[in-house]
Amino acid sequence: MYKMQLLSCIALTLVLVANSAPTTSSSTKETQQQLEQLLLDLRLLLNGVNNYENPQLSRMLTFKFYTPKKATELTHLQCLPEELKLLEEVLYLAPNKNFHLTDIKELMSNINVTLLKLKGSETRFKCEYDDETATITEFLNKWITFCQSIFSTLT
């Protein structure tokens, strides 16, 4: 008889403890910080590309990039590294007084490190790409929007 009351008491205690626990775990906060860093780096790249003094912009817009279909989850970030090498090569066409090669290299390195942290060692994800290609500005804007969307679901 007392055994049942004791088990009920333990169950209620566990429910109370679980409900009063903080809702944002440290891993979620870390993911948010990494997404913020990725967003910042992607925006800096976009600003460098869209710089009104960039004489190579029209040439850069001729290169086409692939974006994933319906990117809605954090795992879709695994599709980004596949296009980063081309992105880096295209960005090297555009160095100017406001967007130096060292800046490009540093931003690309930051993005690669951040992506590695965010996606972890998971490599089984198969990317499905959209049939339509994107220009460099569309590509960066889509990834910025994706990161903002994921970030908003974490907050």
Curated annotation (Swiss-Prot):
Q: Is Ion transport a UniProt keyword of this protein?
A: no
Tell me the disulfide pairings in this chain. 79-127
Question: Where on this protein are sugars attached?
Answer: 23
Q: What GO biological process term is on the record, naming one?
A: adaptive immune response
GO function term, MF aspect, one: cytokine activity
| Gene Ontology annotations for the cellular component aspect, listed alphabetically | extracellular space
Domain of life assignment: Eukaryota
SMART domains named in the record: IL2
Question: Where does the record place it?
Answer: Secreted
| Keywords associated with the record | Adaptive immunity, Cytokine, Disulfide bond, Glycoprotein, Growth factor, Immunity, Secreted, Signal
Tell me which InterPro entries the record gives. 4_helix_cytokine-like_core (IPR009079), IL-2 (IPR000779), IL-2_CS (IPR030477)
| Signal peptide range in chain numbering | 1-20
The reply on keyword Nucleotide-binding is no
Q: Which family does it belong to?
A: Belongs to the IL-2 family.
- Its job: Cytokine produced by activated CD4-positive helper T-cells and to a lesser extend activated CD8-positive T-cells and natural killer (NK) cells that plays pivotal roles in the immune response and tolerance. Binds to a receptor complex composed of either the high-affinity trimeric IL-2R (IL2RA/CD25, IL2RB/CD122 and IL2RG/CD132) or the low-affinity dimeric IL-2R (IL2RB and IL2RG). Interaction with the receptor leads to oligomerization and conformation changes in the IL-2R subunits resulting in downstream signaling starting with phosphorylation of JAK1 and JAK3.
Q: Which protein is depicted?
A: Interleukin-2
**Which organism is the protein's source?**
Halichoerus grypus (Gray seal)
Per the UniProt record, the lineage of the source organism begins with: Eukaryota, Metazoa, Chordata, Craniata, Vertebrata
What gene does this protein come from?
IL2
